[in-house]
């Protein structure tokens, strides 16, 4: 996934293109929506 950044997060996340939710099984704990993509943390 491409790197992305959310406000208030010190590290980068994974950018998932054209998704409204983060996929399961990757250990993501938080996210922020960047229409039409989503940024999932931690990468």
From Swiss-Prot:
Its main location: secreted. It comes from the Eukaryota. Belongs to the sea anemone type 3 (BDS) potassium channel toxin family. GO terms for cellular component: extracellular region; nematocyst. Pfam families: Defensin_4. Acts as a gating modifier on both Kv and Nav ion channels. Voltage-dependently inhibits voltage-gated potassium channels Kv3 (Kv3.1/KCNC1, Kv3.2/KCNC2 and Kv3.4/KCNC4). Slows inactivation of the voltage-gated sodium channel Nav1.7/SCN9A. Inhibits all Kv3.1, Kv3.2 and Kv3.4 by about 50% when tested at a voltage of +40 mV. May act by binding residues in voltage-sensing domains S3b and S4 of Kv3. Tests have been done on human Nav1.7/SCN9A and rat SCG neurons that mostly carry Nav1.7 channels (EC(50)=300 nM). This toxin also reduces blood pressure. Disulfide bonds join 4-39, 6-32, 22-40. One of its GO terms (molecular function) is potassium channel regulator activity. It is found in: Secreted; Nematocyst. InterPro entries: BDS_K_chnl_tox, Myo_ane_neurotoxin_sf. Keywords: Disulfide bond, Ion channel impairing toxin, Nematocyst, Neurotoxin, Potassium channel impairing toxin, Secreted, Toxin, Voltage-gated potassium channel impairing toxin. The keyword RNA-binding does not apply. This is DeltaKappa-actitoxin-Avd4b.
């Amino acid at each position: 996934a491409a790197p992305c950044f959310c406000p208030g997060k010190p590290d980068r996340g994974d950018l998932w293109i054209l998704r409204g939710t983060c996929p399961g099984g990757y250990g993501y704990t938080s996210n922020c929506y960047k229409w039409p993509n989503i940024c999932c943390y931690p990468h």
